Amino acid sequence: FMENGTGKTAWLDGQRSLIDAEKQDVLQWVMVGGEGFLKPAPDGTERLAYHVVRRDCYNVLARGPRGITDVLMSERSRAGSDYYTLLERRTVDGSGYLTIRYKLYVSENSSTLGHEVRLDSLPQYAALAPEHTYSVPFGGLGMTYIRLPMANNVDGSPDGVSVYEGAVQLIHNIYKNEYQLGREF
């Protein structure tokens, strides 16, 4: 525990403020998709920027006893008439070492992945190394995993489900009842 007013305390307070600024977006996307990540990324200063990784932007590739151990994320962007997809794979091995791999693809349309190009093809990805394994055990994916609701009451799988999923049948029944009542009166 740190004393108030130290440099580390001020830095942590700044990070907490940055996370607080993202919490509404995080909560909304996690409720819609059932789960998601809050991902820290260097912003070019001494701070981290935090980004929401929505459920439709990643695939879980493996799980271990303590949660997700392998995930593939995608980020889409457009430059001129080309469509770019950055694939980021984060894998944690059995000893807790985190490896991050990046690949960039370009396509002439938004419906195909296209072919692989160099990471420096787009300026925002030029500083990324194609692969990096941390030299000390990281113990996780380096992101905060958030899941709402905690229990999957739809199919019992380890995947998250939208908080709205359980209400779908109820909403259909309400519409049906309203339709029937509207026809009678």
Language-model segments: which ranges?
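Structured, mid-chain assembly/scaffold modules that mediate subunit interfaces
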Residues: F1-V136
